[in-house]
């Protein structure tokens, strides 16, 4: 993993790393107590819960593509909003396609890395 010393790099590298399917590398993008919205109304908090939630997506052998995105940075906090599509294969062998607009919060760490604190891939879509 390349150093994620800017929120833009963190977001782009996260998408790339997700497609590689390495759960440990993916989890390295999150703070230990981060929250991940696995589906609307279901929030996974902390590394163990994130591992289970992300593994659910990885079981689809997905390809995750990032569309247009916007970053807003205020000091050590960043808000990222990005469109995404995911294509994979369900347990029944049928094609699966999902799309959404993620709303994420990242925080600069003491060592300069930017990590996800909140990852809500359904964020913008929840507003209707």
Which residues does each PLM region occupy?
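A beta-strand edge to alpha-helix "cap/lid" segment located at domain peripheries
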Residues: 1-25, 35-128
């Amino acid at each position: 993993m390349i150093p994620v010393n800017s929120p833009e790099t963190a977001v782009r590298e996260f998408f790339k790393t997700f497609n590689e399917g390495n759960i440990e590398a993916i989890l390295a993008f999150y703070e230990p107590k981060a929250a991940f919205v696995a589906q609307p109304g279901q929030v996974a908090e902390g590394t163990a819960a994130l591992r289970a939630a992300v593994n659910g997506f990885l079981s689809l052998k997905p390809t995750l593509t990032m569309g247009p995105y916007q970053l807003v940075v205020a000091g050590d906090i960043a808000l990222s909003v990005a469109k995404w599509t995911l294509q994979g294969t369900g347990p029944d062998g049928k094609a699966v396609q999902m799309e959404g607009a993620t709303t994420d919060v990242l925080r600069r760490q003491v060592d300069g890395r930017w990590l996800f604190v909140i990852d809500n891939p359904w964020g913008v879509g929840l507003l209707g």
